[in-house]
């Protein structure tokens, strides 16, 4: 498990008046000043976002795409809010993206009755701050549309989004990226303003990011992509995720992007796994910003669709500072013959190797790469305690070394058709500050057949 564990609270000293005064002067002040975590095990710069804590409870009571009691009504509402589910099954968004524009939101997919909530034919765009999304499945797919007719991310942020966590979600079949942090490249007058106005303080943890559709409906053609971290996006943490069957971008950092990629399992990438690319044409008239990447304790395993590649590649025209340490990179038979770094550019770029390890992001307990595969497989996805058939198949592909990059969800069984289920949400059964069940276990049901 990648979730951290916190020490027991400080015990007061009782030996004499001086010790008692010392305890009052120090320990209680530290405890009072410590901000609450978004949820137990939250990591990164966004770990202390309140999300919707203290706001109204908004119940999703229908699987309809919109209207009273719908998911759309809940997430597009105003004010601090915690979205809970009294219905399980499939929500069809009709090839539309929902835009979250109001801050202080927690989406608690873990509250849904078995088999949980799966959103199909659509995705989420986060255009605000202090948002926590947990335990959802989002599977956009091609919707039966003709090729080159459009594109949808499963989840993405846009310019100005900050303090966002996407944790324990299953994101597949996107026709743009499965999970991205996007932005406007140059919003402001200088690099400091570009950074401040970009998406920032983002944590993507413990997600399945898989099967981006390749030759599908994206206008550019091939577009099986894992995660795009856009130009100038910063303070990003990508930790404990499973990237499987994506042709590229597991993840891609664009020009000037800065963040850490830690303890992820990347299986069956196509022509690129992790890469960095500042595209000169997009930066015309602007000075180049240097990118920064920390890449530690990750695993990359080649699969059927993997082409000749290096684990970490640099393209384009901008320089990159990188600290890479303890990354395990193997081919299909377990040989460590794949090189760690490479390039797909002839521009005079510099890959500057940082010698001293940067500080780990808040809450991260770094695992050695040799332990990452088992830890990720055990913990990853929307409902690791009872995965749906699609997640089970993807995880089985990783375990067995099979599967390939796909062009349509129809190649792997198509959209799910789970029956609607219902269960009232009872406030008293949950710790509403962190949206964890007081019983210690999430809703379960009979295994899906």
Located regions from the model:
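Residues in short coils/turns that link rungs of repeat/solenoid architectures in beta-rich domains
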Residues: 114, 140, 173, 200, ...
